[in-house]
Amino acid sequence: MGCLGNQLLIAILLLSVYGIYCIQYVTVFYGVPAWRNATIPLFCATKNRDTWGTTQCLPDNDDYSELALNVTESFDAWENTVTEQAIEDVWQLFETSIKPCVKLSPLCITMRCNKSETDKWGLTKSSTTTASTTTTTTAKSVETRDIVNETSPCVVHDNCTGLEQEPMISCKFNMTGLKRDKKKEYNETWYSADLVCEQGNSTGNESRCYMNHCNTSVIQECCDKDYWDAIRCRYCAPPGYALLRCNDTNYSGFMPNCSKVVVSSCTRMMETQTSTWFRFNGTRAENRTYIYWHGRDNRTIISLNKHYNLTMKCRRPGNKTVLPVTIMSALVFHSQPVNERPKQAWCRFGGNWKEAIKEVKQTIVKHPRYTGTNNTDKINLTAPRGGDPEVTFMWTNCRGEFLYCKMNWFLNWVEDRSLTTQKPKERHKRNYVPCHIRQIINTWHKVGKNVYLPPREGDLTCNSTVTSLIANINWTDGNQTSITMSAEVAELYRLELGDYKLVEITPIGLAPTNVKRYTTGGTSRNKRGVFVLGFLGFLATAGSAMGAASLTVTAQSRTLLAGIVQQQQQLLDVVKRQQELLRLTVWGTKNLQTRVSAIEKYLKDQAQLNAWGCAFRQVCHTTVPWPNASLTPDWNNETWQEWERKVDFLEANITALLEEAQIQQEKNMYELQKLNSWDVFGNWFDLTSWIKYIQYGIYIIVGVILLRIVIYIVQMLARLRQGYRPVFSSPPSYFQXTHTQQDPALPTKEGKKGDGGGSGGNSSWPWQIEYIHFLIRQLIRLLTWLFSNCRTLLSRAYQILQPIFQRLSATLRRIREVLRLELTYLQYGWSYFQEAVQAAQRSATETLAGAWGELWEALQRGGRWILAIPRRIRQGLELTLL
């Protein structure tokens, strides 16, 4: 029985210790290096100082560094808010640069165009004769291969084989102008591709023609004579956010576990050039060919090897003039009178294109997504068929003019195709292609929207570096594979920015610790200033273990706050400098929105900390128990980012518990503050407290009355139970009748135990008093038992620990003796070493002194011998003469 009692006592003590020290409580950390995906708007920065580019982006200062992180993150170029924003924003730049505001629907009327010109350029049926003649003539020609370079004469004079005149048609039309009640005749010049003419409905020398897009959409013209021109810009994250980049060379547009991650506040520079088929002047070209392949279809972006130096040089020859014609109020149409027939625009390709395309095919064969033929001879580069002109032609911009280039000659040259199945005009292998210009173009971003672009004056030339191509790769079962060039302009920006992802910094972390709120004393304030590494330095510990990162959480939180404030201030400064230019523009509103978002994020974090009672505290202990005892962090091997992913499902529950605990604590503090009012003696006589005093008095009176009633009922029950044994007790060993003599004169009367109360002279004390005595004795016995067991437990523990302490003490004494002996040996050895050194020094000194003395004597003897030589010679001569 005693052993069982000891075990029970030990179990109770262990449970008490566990309850005190092993319960985990929620601890709030502010400044942890963790993040989550975000979709907040980015802002752009650029160095371009032209008017429209400056109004769209903030000035760029090149102060953007990258920091490597020891983390693993997933990246996707297609499901990516950075690329989606770039696609949308480049379109906004394009739309803002041309500023469409005037509807050209009044020009959707019948125009009388020069019939000879419409016949020549194939807009009427009469062109059949011309076309057939041309076909007959060309059919007799043989396959030609024309390769030109910078020094070729035709390049200088813009008269290379196959290039023609620019197809332009002059037209007349009548419409009401500034005077609405009178019609006026206007003369305009159109590109043939912008017109459609009625067939067989010509009168005399005129053909009936209309604008090409009148029946499909609303066409708008520029208000100002501005031109779309590409700029270089970069995207930057708002304060409180960051951009992660996958730095792995094997990244191909999708990687769930990229281990080479860097963080930055801004992206690399990006070119806003818009074109189909090719990407010009990109920033992702390397000394290798690599492919971004969409995860669910065959859309690809192929980055070309910059080693091959692939270029494209386009030119629109001629000295074109532009004449603004006011057609009606608020409608200025930019006409181009034909002073002399302009030559056709054209583009020339330079570099080792054949080897570059060959390497592209080899890279496709090696790609894990590709399952077609491995024979590169069966992989062909093809042009898309059908669709808008922007699809079938290579569409690009050259200093404001949009060129539509027919690429058959180029594909024949690169692929070295057989030309027997092609049309006569296409039966050539050339490294240049003819292009035509349109003023009414289909926008690449929104289907069915057309924009009129006024022609540009003068001779236009533009040189570009080809860095990638957009294509759809399709193959059959081991037979043929086609690399079909694509018009998905949006894919260009997936290659440029697809290795970035936008994340929101989540500096608030929740983790279990053994510390409960208000159980530890406050730490002393560190007076030394913290070296602020900048906002990116805050994420430097993202790959560190939670324990190491939490040790520097104070400095990290200060760095985080300083970085946010610094970025906000810089952003505000540049916005202020651009205040006038940013007015009423989409990008200006977007830039201001990023600043507001950053402030909202910081205030949101502080409001959340305040709701938990942790405002402006880096490490905040709480009284909320950790809800999942089996889920604890590995402080030495687990990062905060990994831990945040594991406890994401608990965040809502923990947040609610923290708020409830803070509300309860505030209530307790309120009650405590109410009690503090009694500290001042004068408050006791406050008039507002008199009503409370009256209430307390009434409560006391009612309590006294109730107590009297209870005492009366107890006394009544006691009288009724007098003389009876308690029904809930065993035979009362504690009950002993105490005989008393009521009257000494009366004889003693023996009464039986258990008899009812009588009027005899003998009676027993009430059993309740004896029962109380019994309880007291049992309590004393229990306390004695507890004391004896505790003493026994302590004595046994002492007996167990005493030998251990004795052995430990003996071991320490032996270690001390050994150390003292070793120290003595070392001291003796050191003294012996010192004596040896001194003896060696003395011996060396004596030896050197003796050697120096002998050397000095030898030198003296030699010197005397040398000095004596003349004297000996003289003495010898004297002896000889004698």
Curated annotation (Swiss-Prot):
Marked site (In-frame UAG termination codon) residue numbers: 737
Keyword Membrane among UniProt keywords: yes
Region span, Disordered: 738-761
Domain of life: Viruses
Motif (YXXV motif) on chain: 724-727
Site positions for Cleavage: 528-529
Cleavable signal peptide: 1-22
Stretches assigned to the Cytoplasmic side: 719-882
Region (V5): 478-485
Record region (MPER): 674-695
InterPro entries in the record: Gp120_core_sf (IPR036377), GP41-like (IPR000328), HIV1_Gp120 (IPR000777)
Post-translational modification note: Specific enzymatic cleavages in vivo yield mature proteins. Envelope glycoproteins are synthesized as an inactive precursor that is heavily N-glycosylated and processed likely by host cell furin in the Golgi to yield the mature SU and TM proteins. The cleavage site between SU and TM requires the minimal sequence [KR]-X-[KR]-R.
Region (V4): 405-435
Note: This is a macaque isolate.
Function of the protein: The surface protein gp120 (SU) attaches the virus to the host lymphoid cell by binding to the primary receptor CD4. This interaction induces a structural rearrangement creating a high affinity binding site for a chemokine coreceptor like CCR5. This peculiar 2 stage receptor-interaction strategy allows gp120 to maintain the highly conserved coreceptor-binding site in a cryptic conformation, protected from neutralizing antibodies. These changes are transmitted to the transmembrane protein gp41 and are thought to activate its fusogenic potential by unmasking its fusion peptide. Surface protein gp120 (SU) may target the virus to gut-associated lymphoid tissue (GALT) by binding host ITGA4/ITGB7 (alpha-4/beta-7 integrins), a complex that mediates T-cell migration to the GALT. Interaction between gp120 and ITGA4/ITGB7 would allow the virus to enter GALT early in the infection, infecting and killing most of GALT's resting CD4+ T-cells. This T-cell depletion is believed to be the major insult to the host immune system leading to AIDS.
Domain notes: Some of the most genetically diverse regions of the viral genome are present in Env. They are called variable regions 1 through 5 (V1 through V5). The 17 amino acids long immunosuppressive region is present in many retroviral envelope proteins. Synthetic peptides derived from this relatively conserved sequence inhibit immune function in vitro and in vivo.
The protein, known as: Envelope glycoprotein gp160
Organism field: Simian immunodeficiency virus (isolate Mm142-83)
Primary gene name: env
